[in-house]
UniProtKB/Swiss-Prot annotation:
Primary site of residence: virion
Virion surface topology ranges: 1-22
Organism listed in the record: Influenza A virus (strain A/Tokyo/3/1967 H2N2)
Regulation of its function: The M2 protein from most influenza A strains is inhibited by amantadine and rimantadine, resulting in viral uncoating incapacity. Emergence of amantadine-resistant variants is usually rapid.
Name of the protein this chain belongs to: Matrix protein 2
Lineage of producing organism: Viruses, Riboviria, Orthornavirae, Negarnaviricota, Polyploviricotina
Region called Disordered, residue ranges: 59-88
Gene label: M
Amino acid sequence: MSLLTEVETPIRNEWGCRCNDSSDPLVVAASIIGILHLILWILDRLFFKCIYRFFEHGLKRGPSTEGVPESMREEYRKEQQSAVDADDGHFVSIELE
């Protein structure tokens, strides 16, 4: 089977490609993009559990503290905790009867 932009037709006793502009840069770019899309789609379907598990856990980790002094890390933790403590008063308890 040929590329998506080519049409195979019987010419005399052979199968040949009847393409006028197969060297057109737009046709070549579209073919390359189509092939890459197909490859990425196949890889996504094969490894989707690994890929999405990586993104899910990667997003839950929070900001990186690499290279940050311990005192600044502790200060950041205190700020985060105080923000959580301050928000506790905004919750409303609703009791259903």
